[in-house]
Each structure stands twice: as structure tokens, then as C-alpha cells.
Swiss-Prot record:
UniProt family annotation: Belongs to the eIF-5A family.
Listed GO MF terms: ribosome binding; RNA binding; translation elongation factor activity; translation initiation factor activity
Cellular location(s): Cytoplasm
Residue numbers bearing the Hypusine modification: K36
Matching Pfam families: IF5A-like_N
Protein name: Translation initiation factor 5A
GO biological process: positive regulation of translational elongation; positive regulation of translational termination; translational elongation
Alphabetized UniProt keyword annotations: Cytoplasm, Hypusine, Initiation factor, Protein biosynthesis
Xref: SUPFAM superfamilies: Nucleic acid-binding proteins, Translation proteins SH3-like domain
Entry-linked InterPro entries: IF5A-like, IF5A-like_N, NA-bd_OB-fold, Rib_uL2_dom2, Trans_elong_IF5A_hypusine_site, Transl_elong_IF5A_arc, Transl_elong_IF5A_C, Translation_prot_SH3-like_sf
Organism: Halobacterium salinarum (strain ATCC 700922 / JCM 11081 / NRC-1)
Amino acid sequence: MAKEQKEVRDLQEGNYVMMEDAACQINAYSTAKPGKHGSAKARIEAEGVFDGKKRSLSQPVDAKIWVPIVNRKQGQIVSKESDTVAQVMDLETYETVTMQIPGELDIQADENIEYLEFEGQRKILQE
């Protein structure tokens, strides 16, 4: 598994974090100190990278949390099977995989794209 542990205080907006066994990108991060005898708490709001679900989490800032290592890769569209599915070839390994095309993205065969990959899940990024 491509993930590591970090303290919650080391996170910031735009980072990735594991929430409910899904890789999520942090949209909002805030900390609050509850009082004289309490540790600071962090509130994290994030959106799933591959499923789009919104999730939130509240943890002490010194707690450890899993952070996924999401790879950003370059690929080339080999062919379009339909308007929503395409064959993509990784430009480093020359491996060919089938991916969903986001609805508002208009791509053609032989175009170069950028995509995210984590534990067998892949998503084409919008330009």
C-alpha cells in the first residue's frame, strides 16, 4: 500500500488524506484550542479524489493520520470506446488501461492527458 503516517498538524489545504478508507483531498483545514487544559483540535473537510464524496474529520493535532501517496502520471489516449470510456497508455510504462472520461471533458485519440493513480484507482484530470 502506498501510504504513510503524518501528524494532523503537518497537513494543509490541497494535501491528500485517508478518510473512511478513501483517498481525499483537503478543502478546508482549521484548528481550535478548546481551553486552558485541552489539546488543540483540527477540523478537516475533504472531498474524495475518486468518488467525489465530501467527508469531515475532527482530531487532536498531535494524532497520527494516514496520508496516501497519490501519483500524478502522464498518459496518451489510444482510443475512445465511447463518450465516457477511453483506453489510456501510460507514457512511462507503456501499460494500457481503461478509464472513465469526466463528463465535461472533450478529448480525442492521440491526445496527451494527466491522470491520478492510487492503489489501482485512476482518474483523468481536467485541464
